[in-house]
Amino acid sequence: MINALTYEEMIKKINNNYIERGLRNDYIGVFITRPDLESGKNILNSLDYYHHLTGRNVNFYLPGFGSYWGENYPDKETVAKIDGTEWYFSNEQFVKFTRKLERKTKWVYSGESELILLPLIDGKIEFDKILIFYLDDMLRDGAIKSVSAFFQQLSRLFESKSTLSEIHVDLRKDNAIELIKGAILKNLPYGIGDVITRGNYFVIMN
């Protein structure tokens, strides 16, 4: 998990990964949630763990979250501590981030927890097609046991060399986002992919 107080900060970190690590073709996860949502608390209560778990395989950015803020954000609240450093959340910055992402895409924030996947192709985010998991709908209908269990499964999926190879190759194709969706759903364990597909919890928006 990577803090992204603002949209601009997320883009800066993505560009740094491109320059420093050569990540030209990748997938970017944006975990839209708030501390007052039960589905968000599920991850925030173990944020230190998921920060280390997912950082090796896929970057999940957390809008409205950050560290080392000083007194610049009067609405900040402490939500977690990672490697001894306090992380904060700002509703104001969260709203600014989601509104900017709405302007960049056809996505409209539901008010609940969502996971958005954006393809990074030749070092640039492709905003014309995005993948969205509606996490609260998945929880209510029993498609997943918990958000934390789902992120654990996604992390295992992204650790798979065969899955990563499949996704990276698909990124360069015209129907990349459809192929990536298929690769993710196919490799989720315990038939979860079939359940998610039938329930329309995972959509392509363009």
Where do the language-model regions lie?
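Local sequence-structure signature of Cys/Sec-based thiol-disulfide redox active-site neighborhoods
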Residues: I2-D83
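A short, hydrophobic beta-strand/beta-hairpin element that forms part of a small beta-sheet core
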Residues: W107-I130
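Well-ordered, non-membrane alpha-helical segments in soluble/globular domains
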Residues: Y7-I11, L37-Y50, W87-L101, R140-L154
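N-terminal leader/targeting and pre-domain segments
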Residues: M1-N25, S146-L171
